[in-house]
Amino acid sequence: MFYLKGVCRLNQNKTIGIVGYEIGNPQISDDKLCSTEGMKVLRFTEPVNALEHFKMNRNDYALIISDLRMPVINGMQLLKTIKDLNPSTRTVLTTDFDYDSKLIQDYTKKQIINGMLQKPIQPHELVTEVDKQIDIIKSTNKK
């Protein structure tokens, strides 16, 4: 099994939000992502529902992982709105497209997108990226 390392040491921001259909597939289950106490994983298939929940709980989120292609709001629009509401929330965009797009590069430079995952996503790749983002949060919180 894959576990997030050291997540229980976070004093705040204890929620990981996963938005999209394919990211929420059973292959990448919550127990592989987060069985360390102190963290929870919330999954949303609809980006509008995810955004509404985030607006009400913006200080609880450590990380949002979003698919690029979704109905109503695409992943880049969602992550930009997330960053506008809480710039300290880490963000990861997933896509099955080549991410050499100028807009994706621009969003990455501006720290709107903090990480990228190319589909198909293997469970260990997701866990590694989540660990990386959590480590950044922990090092930022120490400052």
Describe each region flagged by the PLM.
Residues I23-R43, K110:
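Two-component/phosphorelay signaling modules centered on CheY-like receiver
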Residues R43-L63:
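Acidic, metal-coordinating helix/loop segments flanking the phosphotransfer/catalytic sites
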Residues D67:
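Active-site residues of response regulator receiver
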Residues M70:
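Receiver (REC) domain active-site loop signature in two-component systems and cognate sites
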Residues T94-D96:
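Hydrophobic/aromatic residues positioned on beta-strands within the core alpha/beta folds
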Residues Q118-V130, I134:
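C-terminal output helix
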Residues D131-K143:
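The C-terminal output helix
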